[in-house]
């Protein structure tokens, strides 16, 4: 696992916020995002922002934002019902570049938390985890994704 510690500035995002099991809400949210970005010709980096620990929070209470990164002065276009603006906080993040080709987007996350984090010298900090999709693998099934965990030095 090749993890880098990076400093990220605050990022403004636009997209959809859903609550429920991620295996249901992530595809639903990205379908909504595809339709919205196509309708309004909006482009930007694609991300999933995750709120809640799936090992501690009941699946029906997990939250996800399916979003694109937008400029700081971006405003939602007319006819954007259901879309919202959000902020990914600035901070220190552990970033892991992964390749997914089997449709299992959870496996690299669990490996990141279970294999890297415990002996890394870092602990998870306040804030959401998120992933940044570097390509559209919807046709090929091949995805390159940056996974981000907010971290601080362990004491």
UniProtKB/Swiss-Prot annotation:
Domain of life: Bacteria
Record-level Gene Ontology MF annotations: DNA topoisomerase type II (double strand cut, ATP-hydrolyzing) inhibitor activity
Keywords tagged on the record: Cytoplasm, Stress response
Major localisation: cytoplasm
InterPro entries: AraC_E-bd, DNA_gyrase_inhibitor, DNA_gyrase_inhibitor_GyrI, GyrI-like, Reg_factor_effector_dom_sf
UniProt keyword annotation of Cytoplasm present: yes
Localization, UniProt: Cytoplasm
Cross-referenced Pfam families: GyrI-like
GO cellular component terms listed in the entry, alphabetical order: cytoplasm
Family according to the record: Belongs to the DNA gyrase inhibitor family.
Function recorded in the entry: Inhibits the supercoiling activity of DNA gyrase. Acts by inhibiting DNA gyrase at an early step, prior to (or at the step of) binding of DNA by the gyrase. It protects cells against toxins that target DNA gyrase, by inhibiting activity of these toxins and reducing the formation of lethal double-strand breaks in the cell.
Subunit structure: Interacts with DNA gyrase.
Name assigned to this protein: DNA gyrase inhibitor
Organism: Erwinia billingiae (strain Eb661)
Lineage of source species: Bacteria, Pseudomonadati, Pseudomonadota, Gammaproteobacteria, Enterobacterales
């Amino acid at each position: 696992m090749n993890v880098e510690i990076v400093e990220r500035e605050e990022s403004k995002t636009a997209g959809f916020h859903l609550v429920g099991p991620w295996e249901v809400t992530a595809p639903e949210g990205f379908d909504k995002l595809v339709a919205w970005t196509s309708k309004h010709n909006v482009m930007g980096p694609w991300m999933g922002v995750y709120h809640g620990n799936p090992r501690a929070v009941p699946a029906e209470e997990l939250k996800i934002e399916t979003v694109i990164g937008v400029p700081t002065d971006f405003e939602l276009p007319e006819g954007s019902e259901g879309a919202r603006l959000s902020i990914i906080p600035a901070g220190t993040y552990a970033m892991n570049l992964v390749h997914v080709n089997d449709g299992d987007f959870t496996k690299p996350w669990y490996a990141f938390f279970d294999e890297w984090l415990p002996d890394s010298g870092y602990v998870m900090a306040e804030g959401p985890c998120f992933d940044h999709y570097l390509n559209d693998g919807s046709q090929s099934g091949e995805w390159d994704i940056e996974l981000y965990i907010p971290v601080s030095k362990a004491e």
